[in-house]
Regions:
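N-terminal secretory signal peptides
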Residues: 1-3
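N-terminal export signals
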Residues: 7-28
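Short, well-ordered alpha-helical packing segments
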Residues: 9-16, 441, 484, 500, ...
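Aromatic-residue-lined binding/catalytic grooves and analogous aromatic/hydrophobic interfacial grooves
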Residues: 31-538, 542, 560-562, 579, ...
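Beta-strand segments within the central parallel beta-sheet cores of soluble alpha/beta enzyme folds
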Residues: 40, 456-457, 498-501, 516, ...
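C-terminal capping/lid segments that line or modulate ligand- or cofactor-binding pockets
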Residues: 56-94, 129, 133-137, 471-495, ...
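The feature captures the catalytic groove of carbohydrate-active enzymes
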Residues: 456-474, 521-571, 586-653
Length: 898
């Protein structure tokens, strides 16, 4: 049955209901008179390359925030590597839990190890957890589950669209970040010497996640092959010398295909057991937490199926897939053979049980006018039999969408992209900076959306072993959080929804750890976690599992969302998590004889490990800064909500009296250290010594400026190995007003891949790395989605508001002329301003919640404030170089020279 455009749009819109409910206050605002067209500017920054580009890391990245596609071009084919945010091998071997010591028992073990080191006359020994035999034995025991190859993101397979390279040559490929459309131009020169061009178009539909591939004229494609990923893992994740587990493979995927009148269809079903094998239980039974995914592809035209039964039989075999001559045998899959040139259309749909459940919940939400909290799906949810019927659902969706004109689908998707780009826009005279901002906003939109699973280290792009290092998991010591650093200032609050759901899913585990292991109230957040049903702490491993900073860091952006939106109803949902973190920290700190609160013992991220008698495990600067951040946030949150008055007083007392930041007189003057008694001039992996600036947000321009000198000196002289700081370090410099944008561009360029993404690349030996280190070893692990936060660095150069004072263009060294529209400021203000390279030339702001505004004076001369609506004057006061005035909700204000 032909589906009308209206019916299609109505059906597609259901997928966006929860997001709109979550962010009703963040809809695009009416443009100002000098409005920037973000969609048009994004279109100027297309990615263009000359194929072939067969390598994954040359491939063009597409996505809709859930489904991800990496498009690669060989001389003989276009390949689409398909991934999805919630497609994971979810197995966890839970046998380690019985070995995990309580915190008191761990401290006793640490004390014994310290005595052993001193007995050996090695009082300066580092990493006791791996250097002392009995401590190493414990460490290896509790790390055994993490050393297994699972869990990990599971690729959804690869589609290869083949042509005869004698007659067809790929010429040019482009990716339009404005609309997410990928285009490949082919030159056709057939045996009759007739030449023409053929254009392939591919996009991932914003609303439905449909992967669409079409041609503009009949295409001489010889075959379409689908190759599912198979579990043949034999090595452990990066970070361990070797795996101590005999590989136990996932069940093989089930494939099928059929050809009909004017179409062909192929499918893959992959079952995911939730329980991993252990020596005691090598073949775990099915459980109610098991999951799966299904992929269905539907081709228009005439196709024949080749070798299906043989390939199904091969997949039914147990053990490794037998290799042919030289190991080059075609992997088992689906092979569809084409004939004469024909109009080409391929629809691909991937479905998980989460999709089916979410669609039902969104339909129910759309059918009521009641205010409901955003939909959240717990990771240990037991899916019903209907929700597990993903194959039938995928087939139904592929068939439904195949009868809708592809132009209608693309138009609907493009409309959603236009809405995305309407939320904020920037324009730089320096087009390199502009390109960084727009391309990375595009990449963020490809891996973040309300309702999807938060991206792990490598997001929703993977194939084979790519994207599986460290299990592709959530690292809570910056990697996971960094993805979201810029979403608020960019006015994409909706993109934070997956992280909020992640924190909700970590709460039970974190509260259990605090209670059962630490014997303390509240919640202690894990170092590493997976989007899987298992509720055990997957990495209770010394030393990194004992970084106290990870608890406040895990919760930080929950407070940011309130700070930037002033949404009290949201705060009511976030507050229990914020409070739990504060309760743990308040119970963990110790008051010293100096009347200061100390954090002892703790661990500095990836530096010293456990040391003798806590020598380098005292008062980590990251712990102090983030603990202060969270306690001050919870004091304010509890005041807003009128809650926990008694605890509030203690939180404030601790926050106001934490130990001073560790420091030392180094060769360049006084600088901060990561921990008490650390040596000067250490080479760090992250700019941990700048934690009071960021992420702590305790020191900055106009904020505790008595510490600005030491902060800027530390930033200027800190030694960093690279690989983890292409966003982190310049962000801090921008906060201090010392970022040279030319230097910033050079750092991004150093980490750039051909497909426009900046990956993690080592920069310096002498610390953990040596001259024999391959400086590119992380560049080939996967798509480091953490670096998509690069636009946030530029936002910080143009607008800062975290301190309570709004500052325009606080960092302009080699910035050049710049103009931004609707960047979001703390206090729920949408700000627009322009800078001509010398001074600020225009300012306007929209007040969403009617809060008072404090703005650093943009000019030394007199100024006036007026309402945009009727040009009526607004009175203001001045204080310490700032203007202060009240605002009305929904009103736009102009600030001008008098």
């Amino acid at each position: 049955m032909k589906i009308s455009r209206r019916e299609f749009i109505q059906t597609s819109a259901v997928a966006s209901v929860a997001g709109s409910m979550l962010n009703a206050g963040t809809a695009p605002v009416a443009p100002t008179g000098n409005s920037l067209d973000g969609f048009a500017i994004a279109r100027r920054h297309q990615l263009v390359s000359t194929p072939p580009t067969p390598n994954f890391f040359e491939g063009m990245l597409l996505g809709n925030g859930d489904v991800g596609v990496c498009a690669v071009v060989r001389p003989d084919a276009l390949g689409l590597h398909i991934g999805k945010s919630d497609c994971w091998d979810i197995r966890v071997s839970e046998d380690i839990e019985k070995y995990v010591l309580t915190y008191k028992e761990l401290l006793d073990l640490w004390a014994r190890a310290s005595e052993e080191a001193k007995r050996r006359d090695q009082p300066d020994m580092l990493h006791l957890e791996s250097s002392i035999d009995f401590f190493r034995e414990y460490t290896q025991k509790v790390v055994s589950s993490y050393r297994k190859p699972w869990p990990r993101p599971w690729p959804c397979g690869t589609v290869w669209i083949h042509w005869d390279p004698r007659w067809v040559q790929p010429v040019r490929q482009t990716l339009d970040p404005a609309s997410g459309q990928y285009a490949l131009q082919l030159a056709l020169n057939d045996a009759s010497a007739v030449s023409r061009n053929l254009n392939i178009s591919c996009f991932v539909d914003w609303a439905t996640g449909l992967v669409s591939v079409t041609t503009d004229t009949p295409a001489p494609f010889t075959a379409v092959n689908y190759v599912p990923d198979l579990d043949s893992a034999t090595t452990a994740p990066f970070g361990f010398v070797e795996s101590q587990v005999t590989p136990s493979t996932l069940p093989r995927p089930e494939i099928d295909a059929r050809a009909g009148d004017g179409f062909a269809e192929f499918s893959c079903f992959q079952y995911f057991p939730a329980v991993g094998p252990t020596p005691e239980l090598p073949s775990p039974p099915h459980s109610d937490r098991d999951r799966n995914f299904s992929l269905c592809g539907r081709l228009s035209g005439s196709w024949s199926i080749e070798g299906l039964t043989e390939n199904q039989d091969r997949l039914a075999q147990t053990g490794a897939t037998p290799a042919g001559t030289l190991g080059l045998r075609e992997p088992p899959g689906i092979h569809l053979i084409g004939g004469a040139p024909q109009n080409f259309r391929l629809n691909l749909k991937v479905v998980t049980p989460r999709d089916i459940l979410r669609e039902r919940l969104e339909r129910e939400a759309a059918g009521t006018n009641e205010h409901r909290p955003p939909i959240a799906i717990t990771q240990d949810y037991a899916y019903s039999a209907d929700e597990l019927e993903t194959l039938a659902h995928a087939r139904k969706e592929a068939e439904r969408l195949s009868v809708i004109d592809v132009g209608e689908i693309f138009h609907s998707s493009e409309t959603n992209w236009k809405d995305f780009w309407s939320r904020s826009a920037v324009q730089f005279a320096d087009k390199d900076l502009e390109r960084i901002w727009y391309r990375n906003q595009y990449f963020l939109a490809c891996c973040l959306r309300p309702g999807s699973t938060a991206p792990g280290l490598f997001g929703n792009w993977s194939t084979g072993g790519i994207g599986t290092a460290w299990h592709g998991d959530y690292h809570m010591d910056y990697n996971c959080q960094q993805v979201f650093w810029g979403v608020f200032s960019s006015n994409h609050v909706e993109q934070h929804a997956p992280y909020f759901e992640l924190c909700q899913n970590m709460m039970a585990m974190s509260e259990k750890t605090a209670k059962e292991k630490f014997n303390l109230p509240g919640a202690y957040f894990p170092h590493s976690v997976f989007p899987v049903p298992s509720q055990i702490n997957p990495y209770p491993v010394p030393p990194w599992a004992y970084q106290i900073s990870e608890t406040p860091w895990s919760l930080q952006s929950l407070w940011w969302q309130y700070l930037y939106t002033q949404d009290v109803e949201y705060l009511r949902r976030a507050y229990p998590m914020l409070r739990s973190g504060a309760q743990f920290l308040a119970a963990f700190v110790q008051k010293g004889t100096d009347s200061k609160y100390h954090i002892i013992p703790t661990v500095s991220s990836e530096n010293w490990g456990f040391t003798v008698d806590y020598k380098l495990n005292k008062d980590c600067i990251l712990d102090l800064a983030l603990t202060q951040f969270l306690l001050r946030a919870v004091v304010e949150a509890s005041t807003v909500l009128g809650a926990d008055e008694t605890e509030r007083a203690r939180w404030k007392e601790i926050g106001d009296n934490l130990a001073p930041y560790p420091k030392i007189n180094g060769p360049y003057g006084e600088v901060w250290l990561d921990v008490m008694d650390a040596p000067a001039e250490w080479i760090y992996n992250i700019p941990i010594t700048l934690a009071p600036v960021f992420p702590g947000e305790q020191v900055g321009i106009g904020l505790r400026e008595e510490q600005l000198e030491i902060a800027r000196r530390t930033a200027r002289t800190v030694r960093l190995e690279g690989g983890n700081d292409v966003v982190y370090q310049p962000w801090i410099r921008a906060r201090l007003g010392t970022l040279d944008l030319d230097w910033f561009k050079s750092q991004v360029a150093y980490c750039m891949l051909p497909n426009g993404i900046a990956n993690d690349r080592v920069r310096q030996s002498g610390g953990r790395y040596s001259d024999s280190t391959d400086f590119d070893f992380m560049m080939r692990m996967g798509v480091w989605v953490e670096n998509f936060a690069l636009p946030g660095v530029l936002n910080e150069c143009m607008l800062q508001s975290y301190s309570g004072t709004l500052r325009l263009f606080p960092n302009t060294q080699n910035l050049g002329a710049a103009h931004f529209e609707n960047l979001r400021a703390a206090g729920a203000f949408l700000v627009s301003a322009a800078f001509d390279g010398r001074e600020i030339t225009q300012i306007s702001l929209l007040s969403e919640k009617g809060k008072q505004i404090r703005m650093a004076k943009p000019w030394s001369s007199a100024l006036r404030v007026k309402k945009s609506r009727d040009a009526s004057a607004v009175s203001f006061t001045t204080d310490a170089g700032a203007i202060i005035f009240s605002t009305e909700s929904g009103e736009r204000y102009l600030i001008e020279r008098a």
